[in-house]
Amino acid sequence: MSPKTETKASVGFKAGVKDYRLTYYTPEYQTKDTDILAAFRVTPQPGVPPEEAGAAVAAESSTGTWTTVWTDGLTSLDRYKGRCYDIEPVPGEESQFIAYVAYPLDLFEEGSVTNLFTSIVGNVFGFKALRALRLEDLRIPPAYSKTFQGPPHGIQVERDKLNKYGRPLLGCTIKPKLGLSAKNYGRAVYECLRGGLDFTKDDENVNSQPFMRWRDRFVFCAEALYKAQAETGEIKGHYLNATAGTCEEMMKRAVFARELGVPIVMHDYLTGGFTANTTLAHYCRDNGLLLHIHRAMHAVIDRQRNHGMHFRVLAKALRMSGGDHIHAGTVVGKLEGERDVTLGFVDLLRDDFIEKDRSRGIFFTQDWVSMPGVLPVASGGIHVWHMPALTEIFGDDSVLQFGGGTLGHPWGNAPGAAANRVALEACVQARNEGRDLAREGNEVIREATKWSPELAAACEVWKEIKFEFDTIDYL
């Protein structure tokens, strides 16, 4: 190579691999009100200092890459970079710590959970310098949350649409979840709704299979709920699952549901994706449809304590993306969920302002500035004996959903629904009279069986059913 064409690595900028902490670990940084804040549980590889691991997370989830590049000089890294501003040990864990990272707002597209997650929970989770990484919480500033529509309607508007106040709403997932014909499926819906439930539900894996195509199911379910409404004088709903293989097909199903005049549709927001979910949520607000959200696939993401993402983050993301209901565990049923942690993210779904409370897993104060709330849905392995605890734990603004706990009644679906309705109203009345459901719940249920043979039969069937396993989602 001639001297005239020879280049040197030292010309222009200093190339090579740098320690992340030199640029991205900034313990002196004062966070701004507009920053998005993240709390990561970090498990570094042996020999990697905590400061370097925390800085690597900040770098790889914002502006950094593995080497210095000359185009760094064409922008202001100081303006756009993520910053690891604090590190604290995890009690009882020698090799883990919490890294707090602040991201400037300009890194994220307005109104896009998809873009937010692509950065914050993207490639950094496969970074070799880390043995494991878990996103425990996010602080979404009002400057960013106001760029989202949020839930299509919210809790108060839903109650006004249904004309139902002062108690939790009751639901039921139709079983068997797969295999029924559309007409038999509609028959099961009708029996549950006329028996006293407010809602019935498609199971999350019911889309449009050979045994029951979606259009047939929609028609028979609409017929069932209109018939039940006429008989009971109450507004009824069935969560028609619009989830599909393409956004176009999903929207076609939502449009048909609206044409049928039903009050609510459903989406599997994690398997369907945030882009599809936000699209559907916007349509639901514009067209007066409530939107029920199922969280199928969440445990793949959130169940491991050391890696992935806590459900409280997925709950915040759903509130921004849009949904009027979301499944949130039961505390007392067959699915994972510790009480204080569960109530922490239930408050994040429902309330306007939630204070930092590490005892409930809430790492940051969250201000939703009047974004509509989401009703938490308790579903999975629950029955009439759980009703006092569910009423006491979740309060009025919730949906209590009994699938097997309705359809497993020895006398059929309608008596199963009646048993749940009687149990709920007995618990609400007892609570309103000042009785302690935590201590007197079983007595309240037994008293109600005296004037409800349906409830008495249900109590006899499920008196021995318990799911007593230790939770792994603890603080």
Swiss-Prot record:
It is found in: Plastid, Chloroplast. This is Ribulose bisphosphate carboxylase large chain. The active site is at residues 175, 294. The record marks 334 as: Transition state stabilizer. Substrate binds at residues 123, 173, 177, 295, 327, 379. Binds 1 Mg(2+) ion per subunit. RuBisCO catalyzes two reactions: the carboxylation of D-ribulose 1,5-bisphosphate, the primary event in carbon dioxide fixation, as well as the oxidative fragmentation of the pentose substrate in the photorespiration process. Both reactions occur simultaneously and in competition at the same active site. The modification N-acetylproline is found at residue 3. The gene is rbcL. Heterohexadecamer of 8 large chains and 8 small chains; disulfide-linked. The disulfide link is formed within the large subunit homodimers. Keywords: Acetylation, Calvin cycle, Carbon dioxide fixation, Chloroplast, Disulfide bond, Lyase, Magnesium, Metal-binding, Methylation, Monooxygenase, Oxidoreductase, Photorespiration, Photosynthesis, Plastid. Its cofactor is Mg(2+). The keyword ATP-binding does not apply. GO terms for cellular component: chloroplast. Signal peptide: none annotated. The disulfide bond which can form in the large chain dimeric partners within the hexadecamer appears to be associated with oxidative stress and protein turnover. The modification N6,N6,N6-trimethyllysine is found at residue 14. The modification N6-carboxylysine is found at residue 201. Residues 1-2 form a propeptide.
